[in-house]
Amino acid sequence: MTQPKALAFDVGGSVFDWKTSIHSAVKKLAAGKNLPIDHEAFAMAWRLQFFVQIKRVHDNAIPHVNADVLVQAALEVVLTEFSGLEVSDQERQGLLSAWHQMKSFEDFPPALERLKEKYKVYVLTVLSFSMVADSSKVSGITWDGIISCEFLSAYKQRPEAYLEGCAVMGLKPEEVAMVAVHPSDLNSASKTGMKMCYAEPQLQEPDVPGLSMPPEYDNYFAWGKGFKELADKLCGINA
C-alpha cells in the first residue's frame, strides 16, 4: 500500500477533550446559581444535539452555517431539556466559550511533533475554524493547516467534505490518511479513497444514530491504543 503524504485529523473528541471543557463550564454555572446540574448529562446532551444540528444542515433544513452557530442552537435545545434552568446572556456565553477552550489529550502533542517529521498534518473538522485555532493555542499545538467544513460545501460525513478537503491540501484522496477515533468518520473518508488511521477513543461519546459503530481494525492503514502507539506505527511504516 502506498504511503500517505499527509494526515488529516478529526479533532473534536479525537484530539480535543470536549467533555472536560463542557464539564468545567457547567460546574461553574451550577456553582454560580447554587443549583445541582448533572454536568455529565448536560455535556452528553449538548454533544448529541450538535450532531442533530449537523444532520439538519445535511438535510437542508437549515443553512450551511458554522459550528459556533450550530452549538448555540444545540444549547438552546438542551436548556429546554433541563427544566427550570434559566441562563443570562453572560452565562450563555460562558457555556459557549467551552468549545474554544478544549485541551488536547495528554498523549497527542508529543505524537504530533513526531508525525510532523514524516507527514504534512492538517485538521479536517466539523468544528469552526476559530474553535480549532483557539483550542490549539490552549494546547500549544500547531498544524500545517486547519480545514473547517464551514469553508466547504458540506459537513463530514458527506463525501464532498473529504474530497474538497483533500483538494485544499493539493493532494489526491489516496495520498491522505484520515485520523480519527470515530469509525464512521473513517469509513466515510475511505469511500472517497482516503486511507484510515484509528486511535482508540479516550472518552465516551453519545450514541448517535447512524454514526456510532464499532471499529474495523483489519481495514485500517494503522491503528493504536493511543496517539503514541499510532505515531510509533505511522513513523515505522514510513521509515
Language model regions located:
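Hydrophobic alpha-helical core bundles mediating ligand binding, dimerization, or RNAP-core interactions
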Residues: 22-30, 46-50, 71, 95-99, ...
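A generic structural motif
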Residues: 35, 117-120, 194
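Short, acidic loop-to-helix structural element flanking the phosphoryl-transfer center
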Residues: 64-72, 85-123, 159
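A metal-dependent, Asp-based hydrolase signature
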Residues: 34, 40-43, 47-93
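Alpha-helical elements of Rossmann-like donor-binding domains used by nucleotide-donor carbohydrate transfer enzymes
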Residues: 24-28, 45, 73-77, 94, ...
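Asp-based, Mg2+/Mn2+-dependent phosphohydrolase catalytic module
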Residues: 1-4, 113, 124-239
